Amino acid sequence: MLRKILALFAIIISISLNINAQDLKLLDAKDAVTGASRMDLYLPCLKNKVVGVVANQSSIMDNGTHLVDTLLSKGVNIVKIFTPEHGFRGTAAAGEHVASGVDDKTGIVIVSLYGKNKKPTAEQLQGIDILLFDLQDVGCRFYTYISTMTYVMEAAAENGISVIVLDRPNPNGFYVDGPVLEPENKSFVGMHCVPIVYGLTIGEYAMMVNGERWLTDGIQCDLTVIPLGNYDRNAIYKLPVKPSPNLPNWESVYLYPSLCLFEGTDVGVGRGTKLPFQIYTLPQLNDTVNLVGYAHRYRNNEQKLNLSWILDARKRLQNDEKFFNTYFIKLVGVSDLQQKINSGLTEDEIRSSWQTGIDNYLKIREKYLIY
């Protein structure tokens, strides 16, 4: 009888686990219809308007053509292209200066929004009626496209210009995790008090920034979001174009939120190799940890920020007084995480300190979910 009871109990547990487990699919981005490709929803808004476009190499239509080329073929009057970190063609490395200039293919003036000029000026916006924003985000607070979007929205609000955000899949949109940024640690790699992984598409994020009045002085812009079609939030999306030079595939995008924490240490993350953000290297020990297989094995289970790698690296390099650099606090957004890691706290102990902030954020996030 006891064996039967235990067997029945095991079946109940198994069923419960299967019900609660999230089926995380790996999909091609083409399985969702991007906002850019839903031209019937926004082309009428551009008729007889002077248009500026915020775009880069990821701003492609579902048929593979570039947004700017497509709009020009439809007769849209694009007078200026604004481009973020990595440049209009997406070839500049992280942190590399992005110069303004003229696009060789179209002859349209390109204005860089990375470097000293992160926010469009009134002069640069003069004569523009509508700003069309179309960048592929990866759902991570320190990925700077959402910061560029914030400055674009702010400049638009100050100059009476409408903003249309063309939504795209968030390849890390299936979870929310990480410490919520403290106001005193705001920077271009973290402008808002949200967790590291915030679980919103870039269109939803724009709505949150506007709705919560996070622009300077609480101003709001005239914002329209063109939603995705056939979007599944509970999926990893294989993007057709890499969003930036060092995120070449879905594995790097999936691992990026966790591995980017190493950018605030003296541990390498594979920049300049064939596996950027898929490995980490401890040069002092001449050791490299390859996580490509991890991404494939655990993508259905590890729907969280993984701290075990940085905790392990710190333990192995416990005598390295320069393990952390000053950039670490900017990345993580909180002042005490470095101390917690140095003191030997476990991942669970550290994670528990985030929960109240995450719970409060989830209440805000819920108001802006489209999908």
Language-model segments: which ranges?
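Bacterial Sec-dependent N-terminal signal peptides
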Residues: 1-25
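N-terminal phosphate-binding or glycine-rich loops at protein starts, especially the Walker A/P-loop
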Residues: 31-76
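Short internal beta-strands
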Residues: 79-86, 166
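Glycine-rich, charge-decorated loop segments at or immediately adjacent to ligand/cofactor-binding or catalytic sites
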Residues: 90-95, 164-186
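Glycine-rich oxoanion-binding loops at beta->alpha junctions
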Residues: 98-128
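Glycine/threonine-rich flexible loop motifs
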Residues: 137-149
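Conserved anion/nucleotide-ligand pocket segment
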Residues: 186-258
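Conserved functional hotspot residues or short segments at active or partner-binding sites
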Residues: 276, 281-355
